[in-house]
């Protein structure tokens, strides 16, 4: 059994379509301000971040449209499933992210929601630019060609 100091990172939710729909420039790890019932619900593993994005309001970054379902045992003290959640970042990181969004037309999308070694909920946030339809087709062709090339190499030798 692992000791408390040797806890592994546990990925709870992953945005798999993000790498297909966006060209990812940079990633940042951010903490999330959560209530107790939200943490318990995340640990149950029913969270989705596929349709969510991050936006800035009043000099802070907020995670919008993420779905953390209600915790069944919480009764009336439950949280709202799709409420905006504040992301915990340093001021320099916030300025960098807001600058990229304002100047370069980038978007902030979550890639992974996980618990780190200390048991804290963290979000891997990406600065990304949306791909056009022809870019998506091109990346799909590259992926298919890579698979086909691997098959050919395995078949010959």
Curated annotation (Swiss-Prot):
Q: Name one Pfam family in it.
A: SmpB
Biased segments, Basic and acidic residues type: 135-151
Q: Is Lyase included in the keywords of this UniProt record? A: no
Any single biological process term in GO: trans-translation
Query: InterPro entries of this UniProt entry?
Result: SmpB, SsrA-bd_prot, SsrA-bd_prot_CS
- Similarity remark: Belongs to the SmpB family.
Q: What is this protein called?
A: SsrA-binding protein
User: Which species is the source of this protein?
Assistant: Nitrobacter winogradskyi (strain ATCC 25391 / DSM 10237 / CIP 104748 / NCIMB 11846 / Nb-255)
Query: What gene name does this entry carry?
Result: smpB
């Amino acid at each position: 059994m692992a000791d408390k100091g040797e806890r592994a990172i546990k990925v709870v939710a992953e945005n798999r379509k993000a790498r297909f729909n966006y060209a990812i420039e940079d990633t940042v790890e951010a903490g999330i301000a959560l209530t107790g019932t939200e943490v318990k619900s995340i640990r149950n593993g029913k969270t989705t971040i596929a349709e969510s994005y991050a936006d800035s309001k009043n000099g802070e970054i907020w995670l919008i449209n993420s779905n953390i379902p209600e915790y069944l045992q919480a009764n009336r003290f439950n949280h709202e499933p799709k409420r905006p959640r504040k992301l915990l970042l340093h001021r320099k990181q916030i300025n960098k992210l807001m600058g990229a969004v304002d100047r370069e037309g980038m978007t902030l999308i979550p890639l992974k929601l996980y618990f780190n070694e200390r048991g804290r909920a963290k979000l891997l946030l990406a600065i990304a630019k949306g791909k056009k339809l022809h870019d998506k087709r091109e990346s799909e062709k590259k992926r298919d060609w890579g698979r086909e090339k691997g098959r050919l190499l395995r078949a010959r030798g």
